[in-house]
């Protein structure tokens, strides 16, 4: 049985950042992921928003880490060479009765320390974003809101963790966890591993993973949303647009992504088939998009996807609105129901837990830790993906870094993300995968 100081279960964006930040200390780390690649769970279907922090309860851990994570996102993305856009956001309402909700969020945000937050008149909002339907009653402007590609950020953290000495076991399913004299034994379908500490970052299955060792006080209830992706448009909003309905929560969201696409997300609803889309759901999203942005060209839709969100609840059915970090025994941490704004806070949560690990293990700082990771930049003159202009050299580098499937290449360099959705380049990429796939180097 191989021994580690820390075993991290789950290789989505959160698990990758926990592993990365543990290596800031002299802590040996193993990352376990059941899929053949990282960032294939919640991270693969995400709104890509770096939130400002006005929605969170003042004084909560979520409020603290969201504002800090937002402030640090630009420097983090610079370290990891991941594109980031601080485009700002407008939370708009057309209902005079809902303006009071915006005022409460403004007060909330000011208490949380959100910078430059202000309430705009309808005319100011419409001047700022001319594509908005006329008749805006008011809007909450948050210039610190941004957007970042979620799987690119997670994969970058994963690569940085590996280059700093973390180990990984992919396609490895955790079957059981046992308390031992010196920590924990984690049994998988491949082998057993020993860890002085365990960090449960299993996303949608986090409550079930904790149940392997301890009875969880928190359970997850899943809901879903459906998304539309529009091709790069000549005319699109400059900022992220949230629609504040009179009812609770937000309605439609329009996100101008760093890649140039426009992402439109629908309203959350009870989960059907995880990550699936429906004809009815797509029709609802399109109708809501036309209502908010009458001039948006929905003929530019190139794909759709479904997302899943884990909502944490106490055993008595009470909803939990802060980040839920269970610590049922020394050295065991479960992150159960880390949802929005989990992407914004992934690095901050990783640092928060790494400091706890360093204190628990008495670990010294890793003076050789390098926070910088180089993005894929290899190019040649042979274009394989015509839609996104991705070259053969870029694809080979993605494979060298661990992509073993078409999806893995897509999430690293963007192949198959354009109009043809891979119909013209998939066979060429499969041949390169056969030729160059030898695992992570």
What residue spans do the PLM features occupy?
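N-terminal Rossmann-like FAD-binding beta1-loop-alpha1 element of flavoenzymes
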Residues: 4-31
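Flavin-dependent oxidoreductases
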Residues: 17, 177-182, 187-279, 287, ...
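Helical element adjacent to the flavin cofactor pocket in flavoenzyme catalytic cores
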Residues: 140-197
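Glycine-rich FAD pyrophosphate-binding loop
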Residues: 23-45
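C-terminal catalytic lobe of FAD-dependent flavoproteins
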Residues: 258, 274-383, 387-394, 398, ...
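Short beta-strand to alpha-helix junction loop
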Residues: 58-67, 92-101, 140-159, 276-280, ...
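Dinucleotide-binding Rossmann-like beta1-alpha1 core, especially the glycine-rich loop
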Residues: 48-128, 251-252
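Iron-sulfur (Fe-S) cluster-binding segments and ferredoxin-like electron-carrier domains
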Residues: 275, 391-403, 423-440
């Amino acid at each position: 049985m191989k021994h580690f100081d820390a075993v991290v279960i789950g290789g989505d964006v959160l698990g990758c950042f926990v592993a990365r930040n543990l290596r800031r200390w002299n802590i040996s780390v193993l990352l376990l992921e059941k899929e053949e690649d990282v960032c294939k769970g919640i991270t693969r279907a995400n709104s890509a928003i770096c939130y400002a922090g006005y929605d969170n309860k003042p004084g909560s851990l979520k409020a603290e880490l969201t504002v800090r994570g937002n402030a640090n996102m630009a420097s983090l993305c610079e370290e990891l060479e991941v594109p980031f856009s601080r485009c700002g956001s407008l939370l708009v309402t057309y209902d005079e009765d809902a303006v009071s909700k915006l005022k409460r969020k403004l007060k909330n945000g000011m208490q949380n320390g959100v910078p430059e937050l202000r309430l705009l008149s309808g005319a100011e909002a419409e001047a700022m974003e001319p594509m908005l339907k006329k008749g805006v009653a008011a809007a909450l402007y948050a210039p610190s809101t941004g957007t970042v590609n979620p799987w690119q950020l997670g994969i970058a953290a994963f690569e940085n963790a590996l280059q700093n000495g973390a180990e990984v076991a992919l396609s490895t399913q955790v079957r059981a966890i046992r308390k031992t004299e010196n920590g924990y034994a984690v049994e998988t379908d491949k082998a057993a591993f020993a860890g002085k500490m365990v960090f449960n970052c299993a996303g949608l299955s986090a409550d079930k993973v904790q149940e392997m060792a301890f009875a969880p006080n928190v359970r997850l209830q899943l809901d879903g949303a459906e998304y539309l992706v529009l091709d790069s448009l000549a005319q699109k909003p400059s900022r992220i647009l949230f629609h504040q309905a009179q009812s609770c929560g937000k309605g439609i969201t329009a996100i101008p992504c760093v890649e140039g696409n426009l992402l439109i997300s629908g309203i959350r609803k009870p989960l059907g088939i995880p990550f699936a889309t429906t004809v009815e759901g797509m029709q609802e999203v399109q109708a809501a998009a036309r209502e908010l942005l009458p001039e948006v060209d929905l003929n530019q839709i190139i794909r759709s996807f479904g997302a899943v969100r884990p909502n944490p609840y106490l055993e008595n059915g009470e909803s939990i609105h802060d980040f839920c970090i269970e610590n049922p025994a020394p050295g065991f941490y479960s992150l159960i129901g880390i949802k929005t704004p989990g992407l914004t806070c992934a690095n901050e949560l990783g640092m928060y837990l790494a400091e706890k690990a360093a204190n628990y293990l008495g670990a010294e700082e890793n003076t050789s830790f390098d926070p910088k990771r180089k993005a894929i930049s290899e190019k040649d003159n042979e274009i394989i993906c015509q839609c996104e202009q991705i070259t053969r050299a870029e694809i080979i580098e993605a494979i060298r870094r661990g992509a073993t499937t078409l999806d893995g290449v897509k999430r690293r360099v963007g192949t198959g993300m354009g109009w043809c959705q891979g119909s013209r380049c998939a066979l060429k990429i499969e041949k390169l995968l056969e030729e160059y796939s030898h695992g992570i180097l």
